[in-house]
Amino acid sequence: MTDRYTIHSQLEHLQSKYIGTGHADTTKWEWLVNQHRDSYCSYMGHFDLLNYFAIAENESKARVRFNLMEKMLQPCGPPADKPEEN
């Protein structure tokens, strides 16, 4: 019983500490937004991958970085409308 409580407590601690880990009420849209933003940050943080994208798109590295940052605003589009509760 204590082992189960400890694991649950550790999970709650991680979820409160890190934004992208989600929680019980995380929607599919929020989860996908976190994944996409994490991917875009990784692309910008790895210099060689950024060079690869710049060559593939025939753009400068600064333009590719700017485009990735623009995509981070709403990577999955606007959130879906929630059904109203009566």
Curated annotation (Swiss-Prot):
Source species, domain of life: Eukaryota
Modification sites for N-acetylthreonine: 2
Keyword Acetylation found: yes
UniProt feature coiled coil, ranges: none
Keywords tagged on the record: Acetylation, mRNA processing, mRNA splicing, Nucleus, Phosphoprotein, RNA-binding, Spliceosome
Modified residues (Phosphoserine): 9
InterPro entries: SF3b5/RDS3-10, Splicing_factor_3B_subunit_5
Gene Ontology molecular function: RNA binding; splicing factor binding
UniProt GO BP: mRNA splicing, via spliceosome; positive regulation of DNA-templated transcription; regulation of DNA repair; regulation of RNA splicing; U2-type prespliceosome assembly
N6-acetyllysine modification, residue list: 17
Gene Ontology cellular-component annotations: nucleoplasm; nucleus; precatalytic spliceosome; SAGA complex; spliceosomal complex; U12-type spliceosomal complex; U2 snRNP; U2-type precatalytic spliceosome
Residues flagged as site, Interaction with RNA: 5, 20
Protein family according to the UniProt entry: Belongs to the SF3B5 family.
Function of the protein: Component of the 17S U2 SnRNP complex of the spliceosome, a large ribonucleoprotein complex that removes introns from transcribed pre-mRNAs. The 17S U2 SnRNP complex (1) directly participates in early spliceosome assembly and (2) mediates recognition of the intron branch site during pre-mRNA splicing by promoting the selection of the pre-mRNA branch-site adenosine, the nucleophile for the first step of splicing.
Protein name: Splicing factor 3B subunit 5
Gene that produces this protein: SF3B5
